[in-house]
């Protein structure tokens, strides 16, 4: 491709609304342009990368035995009513009516559509297992689209759906897709981790997320230092401390704390170690208990894991914190002065808090705390659960090593749905005994457009993008120095361009009438992995200059050896 015939569209300045590195560089490199909030046009450079990611995904999903199909972006609303997800998805599900007042939605995912298809097309166990996928545009009406294509409203996604006669078959399909994901991300040259995950709104029995590691990642991932264990922080178990609760050494005392409305203020003003404090959080209760509110008690330096809390039978779902007005009406004190002693409401204690002694907590009186609280002596312990997020140094749930935390960008997710959708939509087949069996489903997604952004977050420097070879928009750039002033340079560049192209190599030939500095800057910005520099001086010495984008070092390569040299680099 010649730049003179190409829409390069690079920018010197970064638009003001770009926040993360990938958004800034995708705009500056001429990969995308914003049309409206969360909506982007993919320019030629960006589309080349997107298509390469798509093709790698397609090849590996094909190799896993899945079959490609294509479903409509517009879906009948009635299908979503069959599964009950019409309300669960909330406002992210964009709804509209056609001219005949029939309700439709723009597809955020396709569980309902694919299940309806299979229940009509598949009738016998002999047609199983079956795994169908598509690579298609999706739409989710994000409340706050941000970070460019990382969290856009419209995005490109690979979504696959497996159907099996039993759970053993589902597990086999799930494992095959897990392997396919790893192969795809390996080929893309990404540093990623598959991690245990919560099933979220899609539901099901088992789930893994695939995260590209990057400091800008929105998710925290917990890893074992001595095993392959990895989990999203929402899913990672905080193992119960392997100690017995120490005996009391202090008497419980009531202390005036008029200016300590937070744990930090309590620690600063009264010298109490933060690991000797607890915080009491009031949340709405479920119908399972005879109380409007239930209290959750965690250590002062720990954070409540809302996903874990929401799964407790006593807690309403979705999780909702009690308001200050509700708390005062029940307790007579505000949120900064709450604790378990004398509490007339049900409460649940975190595992770590259950082994604490001599700790401090609110006295359920404004401006007062109890110090030296001990379980059993001052208040009954009650129910103990895992309520908190893990922290670095916690024991790994696998029993090997401790946990470390890193940030990740979720680019893929796989679920064992079981019969969650197939039962609601009556999707079954006749087994070998002629009995109708509801199918076991799996669903699998890769955010193709998000992969592009995640790769940039992981591969960039001060000059621009550093693409892994497999997904770079071009493999090689030719930068001829002052070509329009030197016929010899022009002839050499044209000859090399023709030879590389004939060898099946994707080349960007910068034939613009631009200063060399501008040409070099653009090639570094868009991230072409290999650059060949042609100039009169180097040709006088019988060589071209080669520059590797990742290493940044220049190397002299004999003119007659350049094709073999480049082919070896790309092998």
Curated annotation (Swiss-Prot):
EC primary class: ligase
Reactions this protein catalyses: tRNA(Pro) + L-proline + ATP = L-prolyl-tRNA(Pro) + AMP + diphosphate
A single Gene Ontology CC term: cytosol
Entries under Gene3D superfamilies matching the protein: Anticodon-binding domain, Bira Bifunctional Protein, Domain 2, YbaK/aminoacyl-tRNA synthetase-associated domain
Listed EC numbers: 6.1.1.15
Protein's GO biological process: prolyl-tRNA aminoacylation
Xref: InterPro entries: aa-tRNA-synt_IIb, aa-tRNA-synth_II, aa-tRNA-synth_II/BPL/LPL, Anticodon-bd, Anticodon-bd_dom_sf, Pro-tRNA-ligase_IIa, Pro-tRNA-synth_IIa_bac-type, Pro-tRNA-Synthase_IIa_type1
GO MF annotation list: aminoacyl-tRNA deacylase activity; ATP binding; proline-tRNA ligase activity
Assigned keywords, A-Z: Aminoacyl-tRNA synthetase, ATP-binding, Cytoplasm, Ligase, Nucleotide-binding, Protein biosynthesis
Disulfide bond residue pairs: none
This protein's record includes keyword Aminoacyl-tRNA synthetase: yes
Localization of this protein: Cytoplasm
PROSITE patterns named among the record's database cross-references: AA_TRNA_LIGASE_II
Predominant localisation class: cytoplasm
Entry's family note: Belongs to the class-II aminoacyl-tRNA synthetase family. ProS type 1 subfamily.
Domain notes from UniProt: Consists of three domains: the N-terminal catalytic domain, the editing domain and the C-terminal anticodon-binding domain.
Quaternary state and interactors: Homodimer.
Function: Catalyzes the attachment of proline to tRNA(Pro) in a two-step reaction: proline is first activated by ATP to form Pro-AMP and then transferred to the acceptor end of tRNA(Pro). As ProRS can inadvertently accommodate and process non-cognate amino acids such as alanine and cysteine, to avoid such errors it has two additional distinct editing activities against alanine. One activity is designated as 'pretransfer' editing and involves the tRNA(Pro)-independent hydrolysis of activated Ala-AMP.
Listed name of the protein: Proline--tRNA ligase
Species of provenance: Vibrio cholerae serotype O1 (strain ATCC 39315 / El Tor Inaba N16961)
């Amino acid at each position: 491709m010649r730049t003179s015939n190409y829409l390069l569209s690079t920018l010197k300045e970064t638009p003001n609304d770009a926040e993360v590195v990938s958004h800034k560089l995708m705009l500056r490199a001429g990969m995308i342009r914003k049309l409206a909030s969360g909506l982007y046009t993919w320019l030629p450079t960006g589309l080349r990368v997107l298509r390469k990611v798509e093709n790698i995904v397609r090849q590996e999903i094909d190799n896993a035995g899945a079959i490609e199909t294509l479903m409509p972006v517009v879906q009948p609303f009635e299908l979503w009513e069959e599964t009950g997800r019409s309300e669960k998805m909330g406002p992210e599900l964009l709804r509209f009516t056609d001219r005949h007042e029939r309700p439709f939605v723009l597809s955020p995912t396709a569980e309902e559509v694919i299940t309806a298809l299979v229940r009509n097309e598949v009738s016998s166990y002999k047609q199983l297992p079956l795994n169908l996928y598509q690579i298609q545009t999706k739409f989710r009406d994000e409340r706050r689209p941000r970070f460019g294509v990382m969290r856009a409203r419209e995005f490109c996604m690979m979504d696959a759906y497996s159907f099996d006669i039993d759970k053993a078959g589902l597990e086999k399909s799930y494992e095959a897709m897990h392997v396919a994901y790893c192969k795809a991300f390996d080929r893309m040259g990404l540093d990623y981790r598959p991690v245990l995950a919560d099933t979220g709104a899609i539901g099901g029995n088992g789930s893994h997320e695939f995260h590209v590691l990057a400091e800008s990642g929105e998710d925290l991932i917990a890893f074992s230092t001595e095993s392959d264990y990895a989990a999203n922080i929402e899913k990672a178990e905080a193992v119960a401390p392997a100690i017995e609760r120490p005996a009391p050494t202090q008497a419980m005392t009531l202390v005036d704390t008029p200016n300590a409305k937070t744990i930090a203020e309590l620690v600063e003003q009264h010298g109490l170690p933060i690991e000797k404090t607890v915080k009491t959080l009031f949340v709405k209760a479920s119908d399972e208990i005879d109380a409007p509110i239930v209290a959750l008690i965690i250590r002062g330096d720990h954070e409540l894991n809302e996903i874990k809390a929401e799964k407790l039978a006593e807690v309403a779902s979705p999780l909702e914190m009690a308001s200050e007005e509700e708390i005062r009406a029940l307790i007579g004190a505000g949120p900064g002065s709450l604790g378990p002693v004398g509490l007339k409401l049900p409460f649940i204690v975190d595992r770590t808090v259950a082994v604490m002694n001599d700790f401090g907590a609110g006295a359920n009186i404004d401006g007062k705390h109890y110090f030296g609280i001990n379980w059993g002596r001052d208040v009954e312990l009650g129910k103990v659960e895992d309520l908190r997020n893990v922290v670095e140094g916690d024991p790994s749930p696998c029993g090997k090593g401790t946990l470390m935390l890193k940030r990740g960008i979720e680019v893929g997710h796989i679920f064992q749905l079981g019969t969650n959708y197939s039962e609601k939509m009556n999707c079954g087949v006749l087994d070998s005994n002629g009995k109708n069996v509801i199918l076991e489903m799996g669903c699998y997604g890769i955010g193709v457009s998000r992969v592009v952004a995640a790769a940039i977050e992981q591969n960039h420097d001060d000059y621009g993008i550093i693409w892994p070879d497999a997904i770079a928009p071009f493999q090689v750039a030719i930068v001829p120095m002052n070509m329009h002033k030197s016929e010899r340079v022009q002839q050499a560049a044209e000859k090399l361009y023709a030879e590389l192209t004939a060898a099946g190599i994707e080349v960007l030939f910068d034939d613009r009438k631009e200063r060399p500095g501008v040409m070099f800057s653009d090639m570094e910005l868009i991230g072409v992995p290999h650059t060949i520099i042609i100039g009169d001086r180097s040709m006088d010495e019988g060589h071209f200059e080669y520059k590797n984008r990742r290493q940044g070092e220049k190397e002299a390569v004999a003119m007659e050896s350049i094709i073999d040299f480049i082919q070896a680099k790309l092998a």
